[in-house]
């Protein structure tokens, strides 16, 4: 159990944050959620404390940290790739400057920190052809496709510098495509949208083709919770556990599972302009399994099945 631990979570109301916070509180830790908007439902969540604020606002950030006096920090707050593309200055303000302000505040305030976890991304990597048969390893070269990836590289650099300066155990955890309950925004939310469409017997056009490294959303929350609470020392970069499949394979598995529920994928198709998209896939997670052996990894088929059940109950 983690009673007595005080976990400061940025982006605690997002898809990943919601799942991570639930698991952290289940272990008895208090959570201080730092967000621009409050959670929709706080009933029965006596261990959750909402603090309103903006990552790019240095004063509100410092005030929030002073109020929380956290022992652990889970930094999930960020704009996603489409928002960074469409609003690059705001993306830089939140993803780059907000991250820098958080690390600086933690250093300046001499908080009683036992752990800092930074949510990075496989967007720091490049085309699959750059990497060997063992997959994309955390130590492999950076080669991002966009500003979002470059800002995540900067975040990883700040995380390592922070650990070297403070000796606070620090983890940068990378992930690729999240699917399942709670995933409703971002370009790669397409596969979750396809599952929802199947449940509702609606048509849906998938906007891209290619291969993706899939992570079940509840596993993602659990992965960040484990990186935050489980024993760890020093600094490390890790790939979140997941499974690589093509979009075609995802649709085929969705069809198999849909059939078990009397549903069909007949209305799911590719958009006419769907092109091969250079996603990062084949993430090597050997080091992750060694460092955090209790991280879960639900198979893609089981995750799709659980997602159908979740969206049916919600529908």
Identify the residue ranges that each predicted region occupies.
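N-terminal Rossmann NAD(P)H-binding glycine-rich loop of SDR-like oxidoreductase domains
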Residues: 7-27
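A conserved pocket-lining segment of Rossmann-fold NAD(P)-dependent short-chain dehydrogenase/reductase
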Residues: 84-85, 141, 170-181, 193-215, ...
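NAD(P)H-binding glycine-rich loop region in Rossmannoid oxidoreductase-like domains
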Residues: 55-94
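Conserved beta-loop-beta element that borders a ligand/cofactor-binding pocket
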Residues: 115, 120-121, 156-181
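Conserved Rossmann-fold NAD(P)-dependent oxidoreductase catalytic core, especially the SDR/UDP-sugar
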Residues: 100-147
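Glycine/proline-rich active-site loop of Rossmann-fold NAD(P)-dependent oxidoreductases
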Residues: 153, 166, 179-192, 217-218, ...
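Flexible, glycine-rich beta-alpha linker
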Residues: 125, 146-147, 171-189
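C-terminal substrate-binding subdomain of Rossmann-fold SDR/epimerase-dehydratase oxidoreductases
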Residues: 202, 206-210, 214-315
């Amino acid at each position: 159990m983690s009673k007595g631990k005080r976990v400061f979570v940025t982006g605690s109301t997002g898809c990943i944050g919601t799942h991570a916070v639930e698991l952290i509180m289940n272990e008895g830790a208090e959570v201080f959620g730092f967000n621009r908007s409050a959670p929709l439902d706080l009933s029965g969540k006596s261990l959750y404390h909402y603090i309103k604020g903006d990552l790019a606002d240095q004063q509100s950030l410092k005030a929030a940290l002073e109020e929380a006096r956290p022992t652990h920090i889970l930094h999930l707050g960020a704009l996603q790739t489409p928002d960074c593309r469409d609003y690059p200055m705001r993306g830089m303000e939140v993803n780059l400057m907000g991250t820098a302000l958080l690390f600086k505040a933690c250093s300046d305030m001499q908080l009683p920190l036992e752990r800092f976890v930074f949510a990075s991304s496989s967007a720091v990597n490049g085309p699959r052809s750059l990497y060997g048969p063992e997959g994309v390893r955390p130590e492999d070269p950076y080669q991002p496709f966009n500003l979002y990836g470059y800002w995540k590289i900067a975040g990883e650099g700040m995380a390592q510098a922070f650990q070297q300066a403070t000796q606070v155990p620090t983890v940068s955890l990378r992930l690729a495509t999240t699917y399942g309950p709670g995933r409703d925004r971002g370009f790669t939310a397409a596969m979750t949208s396809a599952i929802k469409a199947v449940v509702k017997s609606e048509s849906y056009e998938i906007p891209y083709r290619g291969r993706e490294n899939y992570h079940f959303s509840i596993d993602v929350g659990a992965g960040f919770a484990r990186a935050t609470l489980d024993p760890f020392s020093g600094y490390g970069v890790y790939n979140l556990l997941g499974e690589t499949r093509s979009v075609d394979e995802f649709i085929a598995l969705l069809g198999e599972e849909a059939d078990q529920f009397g549903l069909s994928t007949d209305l799911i198709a590719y958009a006419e302009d769907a092109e091969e998209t250079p996603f990062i896939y084949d993430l090597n997670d050997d080091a992750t399994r060694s460092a955090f052996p209790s991280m879960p990894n639900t198979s893609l088929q089981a995750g799709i099945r659980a997602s159908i059940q979740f969206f049916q109950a919600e529908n």
